[in-house]
Amino acid sequence: ERFSKAAKQIIDTGLNCLGTTTTPEFGLTGTTESLRFGATCNPWNPAYSTGGSSGGSSALVAAGVVPIAHANDGAGSIRIPASCCGLVGLKASRGRIKDKEVPGYLPANILHDGVVTRSVRDTWAFHAEIEKNIPAEEYPAIGNISDSFPEKLKIAVLTENCLGENSPDELVQATHDVARLCDSLGHKIEMISNPFYRKFDEDFWLLWAHFGFLIRYSVGKELSSKFDHTQLEQWPKYLIARHWKNIHRVPLAFWRLRRFVSQYENFMQNFDILL
């Protein structure tokens, strides 16, 4: 048996591994559907999607089968199914759980492991237990949920998406409601304009297509003769084709993304939370 660093860290807390859950092929889409297993249905209403890619985990937790399940996230794969299934899905800061290893030339490591649960308390308890075995030295200790939190936070509030467009009214309203709650608790609230640069979405799509390419070739190398790339589903095939079609654009896109990572880290020096 072989365990990733994150898997070993989770198992070392004493959690029991019951089995694997459904994901889309290679976890590359925001819904959990595959040719092999079909669609994973939302337990609240089987006519709806669980979201993805950690849809199987989210369905099990939402249905009450287990109180907590492993999930991971590159571009929303914890947060999307948590939202669809009415759960808590936290993509924690890099390093809270041991990161997946990615090639050093990538502009950032966006692949994070985590869990989905039914309450903030459960998610907090999981991360507090994780750090007992392998603390995240670059961050303050999480501690127990019963501890007080006397420090007042500076919270940036953003209601635009990464394209600079307004989000749907109900999402804007929910964001303002949370901001007012935080303000009532004594935290400092500041509305901000969109910090993302104009080509961010285009560059991120090139990064995502590159992930499709990386996964296809790393899996092919791992399985060698057992891997038949002609059996890939349409979405991975599309991403790989998009990567090759736009490969001349990748270096500049990665440079802009790497620059944005640095700019964003500087931006967050002025705030504790971006809401």
Label each residue range with its predicted role.
Residues K91-D177:
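A short helix-breaking turn/cap at a secondary-structure junction
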